[in-house]
Regions:
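A short alpha-helical cap/connector motif
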Residues: 1-139, 145-166, 177-220
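Short glycine-centered segments of the SAM/dcSAM-binding site in methyltransferase folds
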Residues: 168-171
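Walker B catalytic acidic pair
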Residues: 173-175
């Protein structure tokens, strides 16, 4: 069996990339139609969050300079860093809406996330990976997280302890690559959040026992 030549592979790459973009676009369009009127969303909290925050792209004054800074520094960002201004702005809007008392986050080595969190006006603590344990917080953001081996097991154990100590925890997890979905599903199964909002590249997990147990797919 002949192997495809390097030239043929190079010719196929743009077409493969276009197919992936088309697939993502169709997935987003399907979710948009389902979320248009809140179809299937039975949790009042989730319905309000989807329509007031996730689907609302209301601009803030701080967004314009942050977008420009993101554009100029895009090439220097770490591979697992959030690169979409829409995603970073959504995290900012979520914090403005939910107003958690304490925010902790684990960011990529070179990231724009700290700049957006700084503008939120909330007390935010950056946690250094592998050196700082997860103390009780009301909100935790994981832009960068270990995806295999002992490091993932340790993170899972720390998050389980955190959920016990902070029963109303909000956890935002960044899915930097689609192939990490299996690890994320494993983590979700271990932690069993009360409410899950799946936004493709972002997962919002809420552990408040007063919320309606549910899982929804949405777009922003």
């Amino acid at each position: 069996m002949r192997r495809p030549s390097l030239t043929r592979l190079r010719r196929r790459l743009p077409r493969l990339g276009a197919k992936l973009q088309l697939g993502q676009g169709l997935k987003r369009a399907k979710r948009l139609l389902l979320n248009q009127r809140g179809d299937g969303v039975h949790s009042p909290f989730a319905f309000g969050l989807i329509h007031r925050v996730i689907r609302n792209r209301r601009p803030y004054y701080c967004f314009a300079p942050l977008r420009e800074e993101l554009r100029t520094s895009a090439r220097s960002l770490s591979q697992e860093a959030l690169r979409s201004p829409t995603a970073l702005e959504l995290i900012y809007r979520l914090l403005q809406e939910l107003r958690p008392s304490e925010v902790a986050y684990r960011a990529a080595a070179v990231s724009m996330l700290p700049h957006y969190l700084e503008q939120s006006g909330l007390p935010c603590l950056r946690l250094e990976p592998q050196t700082q344990e997860l103390a009780p917080r009301s909100c935790l953001i994981l832009e960068s997280w270990p995806t295999e081996g002992a490091e993932l097991d340790e993170l899972t154990h720390q998050l389980q302890e955190l959920c016990r100590q902070s029963p109303e925890l909000m956890l935002f997890v960044h899915l930097s690559r689609p192939r990490l979905g299996r690890q994320l599903e494993q983590l979700r199964a271990e932690l069993q959040p009360q409410l899950v909002l799946d936004l493709l590249d972002l997962q919002l997990w809420f552990f408040d026992p007063s919320l309606t147990p549910s899982r929804y797919k949405a777009v922003y």
